[in-house]
Amino acid sequence: MAAKVVLDFEKPLYELEEKLSEMRVYLKSGEFDARTESREGLRGEIEALEAKVESLRKTIYKNLTRWQKVQLARHPERPYTLDYIYMMTKDFVELSGDRQFGDDKAIIGGLARLEDKDSGFSQSVMVIGHQKGRDTKSNLYRNFGMAQPEGYRKALRLMKMAEKFGKPVITLIDTPGAFPGIEAEERGQAEAIARNLYEMAGLKVPVICVIIGEGASGGAIGIGVGDRILMAENSWYSVISPESCSSILWRSWNYKEQAAEALKLTADDLLAQGIIDRIVPEPLGGAHQKPEVMASTLKSMLIEELQGLLSKDASTLVDERIAKFSSMGVWNEAEA
């Protein structure tokens, strides 16, 4: 069994949980000395420690710094695109290749059905997203979620297919950035991303983009132009990672915490700036604590957004999408 991943700020909580677990085992074992200890007394100690654990858990996760949210977004147990696809949809059929160079495993996509029995909603959708690996072998296979030009061209091919057949597009963003290797540059990495921005702005079907983990720079926005932008509570979205920003400004990664604060890259920050539309709440402690709950929450929000978008005609969707992205940012004009 793989060792439990504990982030640095989680260590005090982990230590208390370990102590609590030991006390529960001790109580069940019956090995305590009945002459000096009572079962009721031990139960009282356990209940007190349980309350302390819950209090500390809330204190930690309700007061996360921006850098701590970056750490949670990168948690290796966090659900990835395929996890969400299998938890939220049915009848997923993966589609491969860009029909020009090859099939990039860092981006996956295909047709699936999103439905809710309670409301009667049922809609075939095109789901596209970055996919990371869980271990060294799978990370090499997935290129650590860093897409090549053929990955973005595959994504665009699937989007245009969805447009042709009138299917909404859902993208799940989770990448440390587009692959920066020279071979990717030679095959037109910048052009592939730029082409996606241009084409996604004009897609005549609803497009919903969700940042589920890391949203780094062009690698993220390459599948990130949509009618609605949703963002998981403990994800991040920025033009640059905190480490890279730190290395540029301070010539060292040691200032990554300060960089994260300056970048304002959390869901709360971006909602306040009007970059995203909604925050997807996560279970206390992160999406990896209760993946099924997280997937259910996201699914409900996707269905809610789709119901509104499907009522709009193609021209309205395109006009509103372009206006949405055109209004982002601040223009400063130099005096003549």
Curated annotation (Swiss-Prot):
| Molecular function, one GO term | acetyl-CoA carboxylase activity
Main localization of the protein described in the UniProt heading: cytoplasm
Catalytic activity from the UniProt record = N(6)-carboxybiotinyl-L-lysyl-[protein] + acetyl-CoA = N(6)-biotinyl-L-lysyl-[protein] + malonyl-CoA
Which pathway does it serve?
A: Lipid metabolism; malonyl-CoA biosynthesis; malonyl-CoA from acetyl-CoA: step 1/1
| Domain of life, per lineage | Bacteria
Stretches assigned to the CoA carboxyltransferase C-terminal domain: 48-308
InterPro entries, alphabetized: Acetyl_CoA_COase_a_su, ClpP/crotonase-like_dom_sf, COA_CT_C
BP term (GO), one: fatty acid biosynthetic process
Provide GO CC annotations from the record. acetyl-CoA carboxylase complex
| NCBIfam families associated with the record | accA, AccA_sub, PRK05724.1
Q: Which family does it belong to?
A: Belongs to the AccA family.
Q: What is this protein called?
A: Acetyl-coenzyme A carboxylase carboxyl transferase subunit alpha
The gene it comes from is accA
